[in-house]
Amino acid sequence: MSEYTLENIAQVVEILREKSPLTHCITNVVTVKDCANAVLAVGASPIMANAPEEAEEIVGISNSLVINIGTLTKEQIETMKKSAKFAIENNKPFILDPVGVGISNIRNQTPIDIITNSKPSIIRGNLSEIKAIAMMYDILDECTMAKGVDVAQCDIINKDTLISNCNLIKNISEKLNTTIAVSGPIDIISDGHDVYTIENGDAMMSRITGSGCMLGCVLGAYLAVTNPLEAAITGTLVMGIAGELAAKTARDNNKGTGSFGIYLIDELSKLNKSTILSQSKLNKM
């Protein structure tokens, strides 16, 4: 078990910019451009390929893989499954972002197939989505309903629910044998042994389409240069700090959510060690 310091995190941020690894993002059509720009902003190189015919070739040249089920089609599901299988067979790390799991049969079956047959390095989602996954593996014994890509009111992480939710996420992570990254007002990350919380971010991030999808791809970028727990911590922290700074710039200039989205990419591209050290709200539980 390791304890990750802000110095460690800052070093990972610098390593990513130096190495510029290729991150393959199979993501949804709503946010694909934003995701590609976010990956570029943190220093990696994105490729966004969907054809099943080239799945193995693209994964073969990539350093990490991101699978986001936001806008599923039969062809994309085939690509996702082939890519995940090939990634595992060739020791390529990948992250699964089960967007909206729990609201339809196809959104339930697709991540289950991927998790069962090709264990992801990281599963990222809001608390409703992660609980829905846990339900399908009988880790939770009472029903929970996902609210599309948004978190249900009963699943909002706050000071009152933090300890119980940290224990829950640690248990789910241990049972699934993968790192879990949960997004919320307070983010929770666990590898089944250690649990970290991050309190960076801004409410404005929930007012634009794609902030969660961008986070998944940013985590995927860091996954190319470090282990799953450190990648999840680094990516979540970087995205949260950038969100805070972008929101401040938007408010200071009397701008709205459209400008905020642009500022968010700006801040991701500008983030450096001094900002990480001064702005981070990272805690080990």
Curated annotation (Swiss-Prot):
It catalyses: 5-(2-hydroxyethyl)-4-methylthiazole + ATP = 4-methyl-5-(2-phosphooxyethyl)-thiazole + ADP + H(+). Substrate binds at M48, G210. ATP binds at R124, S183. It comes from the Archaea. Coiled coil: none annotated. Its EC number is 2.7.1.50. It holds the Pfam family HK. GO terms for biological process: thiamine biosynthetic process; thiamine diphosphate biosynthetic process. Its cofactor is Mg(2+). Pathway: Cofactor biosynthesis; thiamine diphosphate biosynthesis; 4-methyl-5-(2-phosphoethyl)-thiazole from 5-(2-hydroxyethyl)-4-methylthiazole: step 1/1. InterPro entries: Hyethyz_kinase, Ribokinase-like. CDD domains: THZ_kinase (cd01170). GO terms for molecular function: ATP binding; hydroxyethylthiazole kinase activity; magnesium ion binding. Keywords: ATP-binding, Kinase, Magnesium, Metal-binding, Nucleotide-binding, Thiamine biosynthesis, Transferase. Catalyzes the phosphorylation of the hydroxyl group of 4-methyl-5-beta-hydroxyethylthiazole (THZ). NCBIfam families: PRK09355.1. Belongs to the Thz kinase family. This is Hydroxyethylthiazole kinase 1. The lineage of its organism: Archaea, Methanobacteriati, Methanobacteriota, Methanomada group, Methanobacteria.
